[in-house]
């Protein structure tokens, strides 16, 4: 995005056709636009009832005007809101008038981008806003709200302050290398550095769990043909998302459905029955099922009555073993959960077991976390630099590694070196954000 920051931009922040239409404006010429459309500037931060008019159309509408002079505004520049009636004709007329006055429609995320460029929010807060817009479940909302509200930004600021203090101590040790300083001084500095490194490592672990929460936990259902996988998926989803048939090999491709398990987003994936097949399409379905199993966060291994044999699964992926079609009889092994998707028996117990497993997968401890791969990568860079600094005995080289850690922290909040990230972050926003 390469746009002039001085342009007056505008965008609707509400849908068309409602009772009220909210229009946002930002830029150095907002006061001029207000003067042309609504007369004199109102008192800042107070709602004022005005008639909005232009020379060609006369009165366009009557509504509320709010004026926020920069830099004390949401974007850091002059900003206004028009609260008008929500009809399409009103929206079209006010848009035409704004275009006549030289304003232009905002690009996706441009309001938030200007707020970032004017230091009204940092990159972590901007990413939190994007995640809040996309949040589907309560747990995702809480995670995104912590990020958007600056909780992680404050944690990063504390890490930065601690790192700067350590760098100052190291600089003093280098400057006074000829002095007979007590060995305890350097030992205390290294102990503090190790504690900071441990905090960063803990944050990486929390971030990996939070990433799973942000992206959604993938649960893959595996079993032989006719093991009741599709019927089970339909029962858990509460709708018919997969075709059910007594004919083996009916499911030939992975079919996913989104679920909300206790506030955690889940993608439940039905797969082709695992067996050798001369049918090229079915064989490809089996290959894809095995690939999904290797990438899964959790497996449901289905074994149907009467023998309840479950398939082999990747050893590094946790699994629940389910005895499907339990209503048909047979001795269910003690390690398996008996379920009948046809009668509903055992489904509540299965959902409870899934919820417990899913909550354990996204457990990140108390406090906020960094859920995006970019953020976790920055933390890993910080931890790696601190590890190298702790392992080096040469003070000048140790200082270089600590500087590398500081640079990685700065990239985390967008202070430096993130131009390639900005377009990706803000382009995911809606127009009015």
Curated annotation (Swiss-Prot):
Residues 216-359 form the TrmE-type G domain. Mg(2+) binds at residues 230, 251. One of its GO terms (cellular component) is cytoplasm. InterPro entries: G_TrmE (IPR031168), GTP-bd (IPR006073), GTP-bd_TrmE_N (IPR018948), GTPase_MnmE (IPR004520), MnmE_dom2 (IPR027368), MnmE_helical (IPR025867), P-loop_NTPase (IPR027417), Small_GTP-bd (IPR005225). Its EC number is 3.6.-.-. Keywords: Cytoplasm, GTP-binding, Hydrolase, Magnesium, Metal-binding, Nucleotide-binding, Potassium, tRNA processing. It comes from the Bacteria. This is tRNA modification GTPase MnmE.
